[in-house]
């Protein structure tokens, strides 16, 4: 089943109980290279880490968070915020490292909860209310997702009692839709605003970014 729907379809009854959030983070040195026109490499790493901190901080008020990453700096920051941390087992040169990391975290968490949420780690303008509303809407379906503000990417993927089947990467919204996930249509601008480009960051700042991101940007003006 695929398509684009607002909440309201009958639940299959598998969506009860707590959900767990997965955030997959690549090495900070390799992250957000499209921000290079506005930040030096060192500053870019600081901003990426700050966006992760703000994302974890917001998400953890809604559900427990596990970060899967090969990066020790990101892992330490996540631990300091009370998030679980899983070392990314993905081998170097893997053809699909992001989705492999997510599936490793899913396998790790499934013993504790059948309900999994995947969030991007670069949602500095996301409000806890937005994630809570999206999570409530997602419980209507076995699998669903929230597209990014451009309509091509995926900010969040939800699976209740079924495998995640992540399809993150280029044109992930289309791939998730074709895989049977339902696209949620709520107005959640912060949740939809993941950061890849300078324009994305400007949009997030207009919405209002979290304190860590605001401080990281202000320190390098």
Swiss-Prot record:
<keyword id="KW-0342">GTP-binding</keyword>
<dbReference type="InterPro" id="IPR002835">
    <property type="entry name" value="CofC"/>
</dbReference>
<keyword id="KW-0808">Transferase</keyword>
<comment type="similarity">
    <text>Belongs to the CofC family.</text>
</comment>
<dbReference type="GO" id="GO:0005525">
    <property type="term" value="F:GTP binding"/>
</dbReference>
<feature type="binding site">
    <location>
        <position position="154"/>
    </location>
    <ligand>
        <name>phosphoenolpyruvate</name>
    </ligand>
</feature>
<dbReference type="InterPro" id="IPR029044">
    <property type="entry name" value="Nucleotide-diphossugar_trans"/>
</dbReference>
<dbReference type="Pfam" id="PF01983">
    <property type="entry name" value="CofC"/>
</dbReference>
<keyword id="KW-0547">Nucleotide-binding</keyword>
<dbReference type="GO" id="GO:0043814">
    <property type="term" value="F:phospholactate guanylyltransferase activity"/>
</dbReference>
<comment type="pathway">
    <text>Cofactor biosynthesis; coenzyme F420 biosynthesis.</text>
</comment>
<dbReference type="GO" id="GO:0052645">
    <property type="term" value="P:F420-0 metabolic process"/>
</dbReference>
<keyword id="KW-0548">Nucleotidyltransferase</keyword>
<feature type="binding site">
    <location>
        <position position="172"/>
    </location>
    <ligand>
        <name>phosphoenolpyruvate</name>
    </ligand>
</feature>
<feature type="binding site">
    <location>
        <position position="169"/>
    </location>
    <ligand>
        <name>phosphoenolpyruvate</name>
    </ligand>
</feature>
<comment type="function">
    <text>Guanylyltransferase that catalyzes the activation of phosphoenolpyruvate (PEP) as enolpyruvoyl-2-diphospho-5'-guanosine, via the condensation of PEP with GTP. It is involved in the biosynthesis of coenzyme F420, a hydride carrier cofactor.</text>
</comment>
<protein>
    <recommendedName>
        <fullName>Phosphoenolpyruvate guanylyltransferase</fullName>
        <ecNumber>2.7.7.105</ecNumber>
    </recommendedName>
</protein>
């Amino acid at each position: 089943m695929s398509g684009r729907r607002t909440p309201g379809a009958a639940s299959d009854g598998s969506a009860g109980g707590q959900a767990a959030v997965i955030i997959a983070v690549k090495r900070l040195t390799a992250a957000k290279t499209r921000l290079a026109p506005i930040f030096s490499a060192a500053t870019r790493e600081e901003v990426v880490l700050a966006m992760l901190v703000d994302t974890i901080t917001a998400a953890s008020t809604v559900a427990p968070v596990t970060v899967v990453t090969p990066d020790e700096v990101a892992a330490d920051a996540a631990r300091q915020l009370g998030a679980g941390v899983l070392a990314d087992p993905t081998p170097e040169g893997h053809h699909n490292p992001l989705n492999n990391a997510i599936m490793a975290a899913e396998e790790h968490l499934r013993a504790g909860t059948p309900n999994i949420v995947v969030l991007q780690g670069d949602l500095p303008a996301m409000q806890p209310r937005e994630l809570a509303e999206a999570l409530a809407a997602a419980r209507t379906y076995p699998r669903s997702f929230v597209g990014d503000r451009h309509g091509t990417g995926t900010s969040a993927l939800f699976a209740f009692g079924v495998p995640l089947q992540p399809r993150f990467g280029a044109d992930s919204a289309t791939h998730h839709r074709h895989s049977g996930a339902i696209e949620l249509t709520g107005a959640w601008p912060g949740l939809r605003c993941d950061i890849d480009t300078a324009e994305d960051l400007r949009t997030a700042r207009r919405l209002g970014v979290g304190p860590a991101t605001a401080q990281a940007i202000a320190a390098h003006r």
